[in-house]
UniProtKB/Swiss-Prot annotation:
Motif [ST]-Q motif, residue range(s) on this chain: 129-130
UniProt-listed PROSITE patterns: HISTONE_H2A
Protein name (record): Histone H2A.1
Taxonomy of the source species: Eukaryota, Fungi, Dikarya, Ascomycota, Saccharomycotina
Gene Ontology CC: nucleosome; nucleus
Site feature location: Not ubiquitinated: 119
Main localization (coarse): nucleus
Species, as recorded: Candida albicans (strain SC5314 / ATCC MYA-2876)
Family listed: Belongs to the histone H2A family.
PTM annotation: Phosphorylated to form H2AS128ph (gamma-H2A) in response to DNA double-strand breaks (DSBs) generated by exogenous genotoxic agents and by stalled replication forks. Phosphorylation is dependent on the DNA damage checkpoint kinases MEC1/ATR and TEL1/ATM, spreads on either side of a detected DSB site and may mark the surrounding chromatin for recruitment of proteins required for DNA damage signaling and repair. Gamma-H2A is removed from the DNA prior to the strand invasion-primer extension step of the repair process and subsequently dephosphorylated. Acetylated by ESA1 to form H2AK4ac and H2AK7ac.
Remarks, miscellaneous: In contrast to vertebrates and insects, its C-terminus is not monoubiquitinated.
Residue numbers carrying N6-acetyllysine: 5, 7
Length: 132
């Protein structure tokens, strides 16, 4: 019989975060706290912040992957807002999701209307407008 107070014979196990249990990088605890503080509902279930965190992490990973590809296409090693804009606007589903979102310093997609492009001329034919 051991003397003193406390738990005898048990070793303390390090606590595992809910993010680690779910295999996520984003913080489940912080999302849960923000859901509670935001007055979205009177009560928040234990699975809701895990699900929401996983959705947020997936969306962030998807956007960052496409933005990284856009940066690599432009021979840059750092993602800037322009790359985020190009990634989102060139992806049909992300463009639909973030259609009303304005990205600061994002610029616009390069687009020239078909009517403004020069006309394709036939072989050897001289245009009437160039004859004098």
């Amino acid at each position: 019989m051991s003397g003193g107070k406390g738990k005898a014979g048990t070793s303390e196990k390090a606590s595992t975060s809910r993010s680690a249990k779910a295999g996520l990088t984003f913080p489940v605890g912080r999302v849960h706290r923000l859901l509670r503080k935001g007055n979205y509902a009177q009560r928040i279930g234990s699975g809701a912040p895990v699900y929401l965190t996983s959705v947020l992490e997936y969306l962030a990973a998807e956007i960052l992957e496409l933005a990284g590809n856009a940066a690599r296409d432009n021979k840059k090693s750092r993602i800037i807002p322009r790359h985020l804009q190009l990634a989102i606007r060139n992806d049909e589903e992300l463009n639909k999701l973030l259609g009303d979102v304005t990205i600061a310093q994002g610029g616009v997609l390069p687009n020239i209307h078909q009517n403004l492009l020069p006309k394709k001329s036939g072989k050897g034919g001289v245009k009437a407008s160039q004859e004098l």
